[in-house]
Amino acid sequence: MKEPSKIDKVLPIVTVLTMAATGSEMDQFAVISKMDTNEKLGTSSWNMIPKTSICDPEYLYTLPSIQTAAGTADIMSHVFEEYFSKTTDAFVQDKFAEGLLQTCIKYCPIALKDPENYEARANLMWASSMALNGLCGSGKEGAWSCHPIEHELSAFYDITHGVGLAIVTPRWMRYILSENTVDKFVEYAINVWHMPVKEDKFALANEAIDATEKFFKDCGIPMTLEELNIDETYFDNMAKAAVSHGGLAYAYV
């Protein structure tokens, strides 16, 4: 992420939300892509929070289905990046997070089936705003591992950010699942997916990860890089850049 301290003056920002996804209507983040150099870098400043945001769910009625699904994956990824954290005493924040995840799981399929369902669009829009406005991550350590990885995918290839996140997220979850992290995945399984308690914690954790992947797939998101015609050509460059830009100081492993 580029040095945010250099952003000392910002013109007043007003947003009109046309997609529930990034949370720009209520957050301080920005991402800039430079396709000729394959760079996609983020930055942030509290000065960049919009002064006013117009959030009318009816503006989302005409979104293509893939953008509705990808936007939901982006919202969920924002929550995951802060929910899966080494910080263990943030009960309120985690309950916020679980509620937002349940909202996405409930309302994305409804919006896909009935694009003009006001309730579904309104709840997804509100989830977008709440996922990255600071509440879920307040007081928590987080590495934001998936976003730097996906930023490299969409820096080198013309893919939708949320699609890349949906592909990366379940694989990241399986990679980090360990004795140190399994209890959090058990919480996720029980509190978000309403799965019954099992004696085998790892079996329950993997069921929750499988449910996450299936949800994205059922929403119509391609779930492999092959489907997007992405091969291993740039993987080494991507990996180096992801670590350089994202860092591993608070990685949840």
Please describe what each predicted stretch is:
Residues E82-A211:
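Active-site segments that bind and position negatively charged phosphate/pyrophosphate groups
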Residues K2-V92, D183, E187:
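A glycine/threonine-rich phosphate-anchoring loop and its flanking beta-alpha core
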Residues F185, V192-V253:
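C-terminal charged capping/lid subdomain of soluble metabolic enzymes
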Residues M19-A21, A69, L135, T160, ...:
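Short glycine/serine/threonine-biased micro-segments
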